[in-house]
């Protein structure tokens, strides 16, 4: 059995292997942007409401708050900074989470279930002597990662970037899931089982590297002498800071930059792209990023193609993603 699972589906696949796969020959479980340690975006949605562009549709928010599966996606790491008594979501004061019925109990239950999963995966690997997990992730796109309690408003502020306790090499993510969350405990020291992609969260299922990876299972098995441990890396990445949903009818800022595998910023000759059939050209900033104004978009989902040219030693780097527009 070969499983390919995106986002939360990877948690389902990992749980199945850890607890329910006895007697089944599992060749590989490939997860794409799976929030093994949760995502701050879920915390923001539950506490501050589901946002569609600048709007917070209350009916949608009320419905989402009734789904236990969203609590499973809460950060299971120390996401809250500046308050020693409230490091995890389930520790947050009732005044912060009062709009969500039973928040603390549900968050604590989800945290314990998550820790149970990680422990079960470690035990399964130790007992079976093998680890079928391969975790694909994307890094560098601006991603919600930490939270703090605003002293003036006494509200929870969820912001982009990892908590200060996380090393800089793990900064960023796929726009939804921080890169360190896409790596389960059991793969922390298994570098060959971690592979980097280019795109944002919703685009990972369309990456050619994943397709090529899965396509290998359609081949006849090669003899051991012909097998090699080849890394599937690339040398440059185009990073994008763009909200998943933007207001329709208004121009929206997008920021882009090119980095290498170590996160060092690379120079480029031109950066720009196309969204909804309309071209845009980015201007160089002083901080390594390029900035552009996306043209006003009609309501709906639009394809975005961004590219950087004249990247030293690489040439052209491209990224394809999507953006929603809503009013």
How would you name each of these model-derived features?
Residues 4-9:
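Gly/Ala-rich beta-loop-alpha elbow adjacent to hydrolase catalytic centers
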Residues 10-20:
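Short glycine-enriched nucleophile-adjacent loop
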Residues 18-232:
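Helical cap/lid subdomain of alpha/beta-hydrolase-fold lipid enzymes
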Residues 244-250:
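Short, solvent-exposed loop/linker segments at the N-terminal edge
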Residues 250-262:
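Beta-strand-rich structural segments
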Residues 284-293:
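Aromatic sugar-binding surface patches on proteins
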Residues 295-301:
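Surface-exposed, short loops/turns at beta-strand junctions within beta-sandwich domains
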Residues 312-327:
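Edge beta-strands of extracellular beta-sandwich domains
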């Amino acid at each position: 059995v070969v499983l390919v699972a995106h986002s939360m589906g990877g948690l389902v696949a990992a749980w199945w292997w850890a607890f329910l796969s006895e007697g089944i020959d599992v060749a590989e479980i490939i997860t794409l942007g799976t929030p093994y340690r949760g995502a701050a975006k879920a915390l923001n949605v539950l506490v501050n409401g589901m946002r569609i562009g600048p709007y917070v549709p209350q009916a949608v928010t009320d419905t989402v708050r009734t789904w236990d599966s969203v609590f499973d996606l809460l950060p299971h790491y120390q996401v809250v900074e500046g308050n020693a008594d409230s490091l995890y979501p389930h520790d947050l004061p009732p005044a912060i989470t009062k709009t969500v019925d039973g928040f603390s109990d549900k968050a604590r239950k989800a945290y314990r279930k998550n820790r149970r999963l990680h422990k079960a995966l470690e035990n399964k690997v130790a007992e079976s002597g093998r680890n079928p997990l391969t975790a694909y992730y994307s890094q560098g796109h601006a991603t919600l990662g930490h939270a703090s309690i605003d002293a003036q408003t006494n509200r929870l502020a969820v912001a982009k970037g990892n908590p200060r306790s996380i090393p800089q090499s793990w900064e960023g993510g796929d726009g939804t899931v921080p890169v360190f969350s896409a790596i389960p405990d059991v793969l922390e020291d298994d570098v060959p089982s971690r592979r980097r992609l280019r795109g944002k969260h919703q685009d990972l299922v369309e990456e050619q590297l994943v397709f090529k990876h899965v396509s290998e299972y359609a081949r006849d098995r090669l003899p051991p002498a012909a097998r090699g441990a080849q890394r599937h890396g690339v040398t440059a990445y185009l990073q994008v800071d763009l909200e998943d949903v933007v207001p329709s009818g208004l121009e929206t800022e997008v920021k882009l930059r090119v980095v290498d595998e170590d996160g060092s910023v690379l120079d480029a000759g031109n950066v720009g792209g196309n969204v909804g059939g309309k071209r845009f050209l980015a201007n160089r900033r002083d901080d390594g990023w390029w900035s552009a104004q996306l043209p006003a978009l009609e309501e709906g989902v639009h394809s975005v193609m961004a590219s950087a040219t004249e990247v030293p030693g690489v040439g052209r780097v491209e990224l394809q993603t999507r953006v929603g527009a809503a009013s």
